[in-house]
From Swiss-Prot:
This is Gonadotropin subunit beta-2. It comes from the Eukaryota. Involved in gametogenesis and steroidogenesis. Keywords: Disulfide bond, Glycoprotein, Hormone, Secreted, Signal. PROSITE patterns: GLYCO_HORMONE_BETA_1, GLYCO_HORMONE_BETA_2. It comes from Fundulus heteroclitus.
Amino acid sequence: MVCLFLGASSFIWSLAPAAAAFQLPRCQLLNQTISLEKRGCSGCHRVETTICSGYCATKDPNYKTSYNKAIQHVCTYGDLYYKTFEFPECVPGVDPVVTYPVALSCRCGGCAMATSDCTFESLQPDFCMNDIPFYH
């Protein structure tokens, strides 16, 4: 049994150089176009911002206990500030101003659902709901 485990282990380590050659980009700042929309305001406006994107090393133990909880790290904001955008045409009574984040630094950590999209696969950042045809 031990020999089988060591054999499998050495087989996996022999694949390590091939995996390292793939070179996933580490968690870093990335310039990105995002879309801004607001109910009561016309159009979809694309703006440039800086987001966090990339790979974070993580571990998932084979033998799980209450002492070794697996925490999956994601690339998330370190420091950020918010910019404002004013929509040119909004119906009366609607505040035309929206804010969006601009990343100043990135880090690998737990996903904060209050500030990040923690889903497996989400909409692209420049996606506009206004671009979807509406059928009656």
